[in-house]
Design a protein with these regions (language model features):
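A short, structured loop/turn motif at beta-sheet edges
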Residues: 81-84, 114-121, 155-159
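Bacterial N-terminal signal peptides that target proteins for export
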Residues: 2-15
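Short, solvent-exposed beta-strand/turn "edge" segments of beta-rich domains on protein surfaces
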Residues: 59-65, 73-87, 97-104, 154-156
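Helix-rich interaction surfaces within compact, conserved domain-sized segments
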Residues: 35-36, 122-183
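Post-signal peptide N-terminal segment of mature Sec-exported envelope proteins
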Residues: 34-57
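C-terminal motif of bacterial Sec signal peptides marking the signal peptidase cleavage site
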Residues: 21-25
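Beta-strand elements of well-folded, non-transmembrane domains
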Residues: 71-76, 89-99, 110-118, 130-134, ...
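Bacterial signal peptide processing site
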Residues: 27-30
Length: 183
């Protein structure tokens, strides 16, 4: 084959090479080839609120403090060529001092659990402290972000997981919440 015939043949094949190069962009190296969604997040209804009383009576005069999960903020992004989902989650907790409060600092324990199907993959026990200045009885606190990299693939996507958030309650507080939840 002479040089001119080779160049003519090469020119005829250029569209084929161009098409193959476009297809190669759809492989695992293309960040747009696999764009996972963020993990669904939920607040456990039974663990969304916490009341602490000074004494056995559960009336307003003995309320030391009350806390509740007011919201969850977060972001997610592809953390590794479609193999991990980089997730950040922060919790917003509202805290109110009650008439029986004797301290200005209250530590609120909470958790963020990563659930896959019906299994708890990991549970992060965390806490945040409310510092009440004089003449302030209500605060909204935002936690530092919890950072997690979740393994994902085309078969095991972000919908396979969910984050569950709640306040870490004593058995008595949990029973109280269950008893007083709307049905």
């Amino acid at each position: 084959m002479n040089v001119s015939a080779f160049l003519v043949r090469l020119t005829q094949m250029l569209p084929l090479f161009a098409g193959l190069s476009l297809l190669s962009a759809c492989g695992p190296e293309d960040p747009n080839a696999f764009a996972p969604e963020c993990v669904p997040v939920g607040i456990l209804a039974e663990a969304a609120d916490m009341s602490s009383y000074a004494g056995p009576s559960h009336d307003l005069s003995t309320l030391a403090f009350q806390a509740g999960i007011a919201g969850i903020n977060g972001t997610c992004s592809d953390a590794g060529k479609g193999h991990a989902l980089h997730t950040q989650a922060s919790v917003v907790i509202s805290v109110q001092r009650g008439p029986a409060a004797t301290v200005r600092d209250v530590t609120i324990p909470y958790f963020i659990a990563l659930v896959h199907g019906s299994d708890i993959v990991s549970k992060h026990d965390l806490s945040i402290t409310a510092h009440f200045p004089p003449n302030v009885d209500r605060l909204a606190l935002k936690s530092d972000p919890l950072i997690m990299d979740l393994p994902i693939s085309r078969r095991m996507n972000s919908d396979s997981y969910r984050l569950e958030v709640g306040l870490q309650l004593t058995p008595e507080q949990l029973a109280y919440n269950r008893e007083h939840m709307p049905h």
